[in-house]
């Protein structure tokens, strides 16, 4: 028996090390004051080891091997996902493996996005399996135990199993819907994934009826409002080119580096016939780039379940492509990568695009990094568009400024400082400069094709390019900005609306997000959506600015212009452990819990209500295609 327990103690340090590394790599060590978290993880992990050790046969051994392998892989996935998105992975993300597989060939993409420290979650694996085998061999079989030893041995293990089941049910299932339990479920590994499966798998099976009137009432109360008709129809009848720019952060606009303008062409654009929104924020869900598209095209929030291009591929939509087709426009999409990425090939059909030009159809004359270079994309797009009947709507997604920001040296024009050579930060500035040059070329191509004067150009960033969760990036960015780099800068992407002949240039500081692009464009083009389910508002006539957040800082986070603050909810899902930044100077603010709770509830309700609209395909009741 002494030998039996000795093998258990040998395994203990490695199990404890696994728990420590996991919560360290997912940045949750500071939440261990919620005592249930370490207690529950220890109970489940040590309990699994102990109970499986009771058996002496191959079945027990393989049950443990399989269970521990799954736990280890999920912990690794959680650590990797959290290092970029700040949250654990969900069962819904299993569907993203197809997209991951498409970019896995470029290890630099994944390497730049994921913290190398995640590999440490695997370090215990061979040792625990080895000591488990010794434990199993060194123990006494139940059949040979005396009754005096058998009864307490089995009794203790039965109580351990009962405790595991009861605790798992209470915390993982949360039958009484307690807030204190929800807090634990945001942090603790086993109960988070139990709750995630229950909510996202079983929850769909229990879906009931929807109250459309209640949804419309909620929208009336919570969706930010716009009043007035300023600039209505100033772009009516014009062609529309909507450009989603990969990883374009707002901090590069007007900035200089090493005595060089980072975005000279965009800077020039802002001086004439342009609206520039400098407090504009990404509203991506778990679909990241594809969800940015979804929000911009439809005025709908993505969600934290799954990328909308897959989850709602069979829904009926009435976004920009369908609205403008109803006005006699042609609708075309361009992307210099494979057409199946993010399920675009299928999703674009329901979005209303008549043709999707991807790498399978474009000429891959110049490739750098992730796909067709931006200059070549713009050149080929204009060549195609000038042959199309007018007016047209063109949606273009750029690619050159994609992580890991590796630009062919022949295309690089920015002179980097020695300390920034070979870094993610330096690479980002280099590709940003190239993308800006591409915008200059786009204007030239449009003028040469005779399209410029009759075309409204809308440019926005899809999501952050510099992830503050990466220590080296945060350090470089803080040095560049002259202040600590935080979420207020990271989530800030530009929105630029250029209308030749507008006759004015204005910087607008109204807080907005990608859900506001559709209603803002509708006002400028004087068109209507034909349904009431628009969750954004016209930023040119906004009464207030409010944006709900999903990814990176978590559901329940928000950005509001009324109080000039960005609020990031705590990783335990509570307002009390959240953080607040002042949008005016980027400094941390004292948290007003009551006010933050009010806004947080509003943000959550907006996301939940929008999800109901999508889950029940309510737009289909208003339109037919």
Predicted feature descriptions by range:
Residues 83, 104, 191, 205, ...:
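Hydrophobic residues in alpha-helical segments
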Residues 80-93, 111-115, 198, 202-212, ...:
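A diffuse structural propensity rather than consistent per-protein peaks
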Residues 164-237, 243:
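Membrane-interface segments at or immediately adjacent to transmembrane helices
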Residues 2-197:
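Transmembrane and membrane-interface helices of multi-pass
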Residues 139-147, 175, 195, 199-202, ...:
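Generic N-terminal initiation segments characterized by hydrophobic and/or small/turn-forming residues
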Residues 217-625:
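Solvent-exposed soluble domains appended to multi-pass membrane proteins
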């Amino acid at each position: 028996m002494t030998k039996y327990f000795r093998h258990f103690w040998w395994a203990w340090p490695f199990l404890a090390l696994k728990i420590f590394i996991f919560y360290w790599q997912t940045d949750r060590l500071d939440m261990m004051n919620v005592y249930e978290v370490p207690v529950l993880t220890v109970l489940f992990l040590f309990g699994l080891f102990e109970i499986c050790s009771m058996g002496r046969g191959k079945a027990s051994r393989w049950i443990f091997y399989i269970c521990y392998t799954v736990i280890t892989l999920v912990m690794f996935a959680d650590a990797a996902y959290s290092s970029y998105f700040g949250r654990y992975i969900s069962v819904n993300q299993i569907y993203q493996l197809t997209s991951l597989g498409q970019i896995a060939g470029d290890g630099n993409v994944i390497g730049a996005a994921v913290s190398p420290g995640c590999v440490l979650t695997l370090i215990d694996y061979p040792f625990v399996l080895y000591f488990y085998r010794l434990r199993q061999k060194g123990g006494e079989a139940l059949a040979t135990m005396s009754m005096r030893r058998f009864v307490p041995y089995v009794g203790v293990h039965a109580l351990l199993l009962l405790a595991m089941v009861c605790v798992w049910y209470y915390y993982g299932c949360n039958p009484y819907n307690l807030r204190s339990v929800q807090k634990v479920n945001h942090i603790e590994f086993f109960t988070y994934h139990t709750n995630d499966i229950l909510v996202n798998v079983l929850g769909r099976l229990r879906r009931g009826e929807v109250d459309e009137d209640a949804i419309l009432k909620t929208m009336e109360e919570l969706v930010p409002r716009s009043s007035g008709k300023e600039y209505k129809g100033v772009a009516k009848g014009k062609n529309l080119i909507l450009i989603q720019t990969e990883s374009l952060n707002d901090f590069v606009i007007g900035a200089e580096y090493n005595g060089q303008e980072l975005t000279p062409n965009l800077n020039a654009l802002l001086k004439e016939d342009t609206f520039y929104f400098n407090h504009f924020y990404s509203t991506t869900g778990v679909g990241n780039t594809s969800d940015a598209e979804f929000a911009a095209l439809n005025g709908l929030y993505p969600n934290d379940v799954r990328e909308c291009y897959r989850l709602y591929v069979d829904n009926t939509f009435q976004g920009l492509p369908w609205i403008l087709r109803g006005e006699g426009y042609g609708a075309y999409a361009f992307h210099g990568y494979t057409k199946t990425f993010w399920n675009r090939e299928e999703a674009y059909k329901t979005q209303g695009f008549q043709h999707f030009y991807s790498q399978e159809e474009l000429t891959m004359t110049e490739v750098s990094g992730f796909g067709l270079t931006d200059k070549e994309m713009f050149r080929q797009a204009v060549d195609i568009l000038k042959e199309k009947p007018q007016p047209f709507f063109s949606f273009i997604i750029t690619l050159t400024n994609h992580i890991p920001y590796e630009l062919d040296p022949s295309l690089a024009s920015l002179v980097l400082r020695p300390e920034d050579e070979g870094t993610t930060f330096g690479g980002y500035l280099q590709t940003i400069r190239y993308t800006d040059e591409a915008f200059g070329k786009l204007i030239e191509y449009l003028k040469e094709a005779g399209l410029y004067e009759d075309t409204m150009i809308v440019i926005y960033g899809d999501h952050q390019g510099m992830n503050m969760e990466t220590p080296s990036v945060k350090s470089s960015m803080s040095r560049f900005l002259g202040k600590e780099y935080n979420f207020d800068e990271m989530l800030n992407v530009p929105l630029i609306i250029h209308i030749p002949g507008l006759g004015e240039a204005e910087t607008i500081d109204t807080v907005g997000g990608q859900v506001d692009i559709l209603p803002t464009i509708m006002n400028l083009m004087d068109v209507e959506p034909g349904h009431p389910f628009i969750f954004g508002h016209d930023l040119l006539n906004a009464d207030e600015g409010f944006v709900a957040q999903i990814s990176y800082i978590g559901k329940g986070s928000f950005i509001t212009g009324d109080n000039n603050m960005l609020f990031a909810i705590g990783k335990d899902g509570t307002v009390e452990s959240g953080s607040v930044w002042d949008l005016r100077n980027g400094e941390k603010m004292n948290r007003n819990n009551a006010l933050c709770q009010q806004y947080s509830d509003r943000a959550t309700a907006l996301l939940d209500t929008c999800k109901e609209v999508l889950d029940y395909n309510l737009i289909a009741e208003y339109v037919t295609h």
